[in-house]
Amino acid sequence: MTNLINESFTLPCGQILKNRVCKAAMTERIAKGDNLANQGHINLYDMWADGDIGILLTGNVQVDRRNLEGPANVVIDKNNYKNQLGTLKEWSAAGTKNNTQLWMQISHAGRQTPGEINSSPMAPSNIRLNIPGKNYGTPVPMTEEDILDVIEKFVFTAKIARETGFTGVQFHSAHGYLLSEFLSPDINNRNDAWGGDIESRACLLYTSDAADDW
């Protein structure tokens, strides 16, 4: 019997995966206080790329340092990207050896930003996240300007990923972070173009994806 897991697979975009094994995105939290990629990321993905995996997904790389999943996340924004271009290229080189695909997971934590990082995180509405033992602040509903700025941030980070050798990106739209908050009718109670039916709630995700010319 043919083992499909070990067979190559061509994605609709034309990218060829050497097999059908994927390392899921798992937050690394090994950046320092500057939130820059470092040697730890290079070493980790160098090791994983030796594991005969078709796709390696990174942990969430944040687009906005004010809204992080954790204090040791990598952030790529217009203020710091030049300081880590070399490291990002080394990271991608390590993660793409042995014909491995390396996709950067791009994220914005939204209301799920820990309170010690930001007590007033951005979100589609002001519905606070209540989890026993966790400290999350009351979010500030995003303005139209905020939403357009976030779209620009997602696109910028994707652009840097491409330019530094990552072979794809994943927009993190699950696990309670910003994009999934907009998708959820329980969190997104907006009555403008970014809320309401599922098409409108998905507009942030669709617009970010459409603006990214990968």
PLM region spans:
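N-terminal capping/small domains of soluble enzymes
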Residues: M1-S107, V150
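Short coil-to-beta-strand
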Residues: L17-V21, I53-D64, M122-R128, G168-F182
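Single conserved hydrophobic/aromatic residue that forms the stacking wall/gate
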Residues: Y206-W214
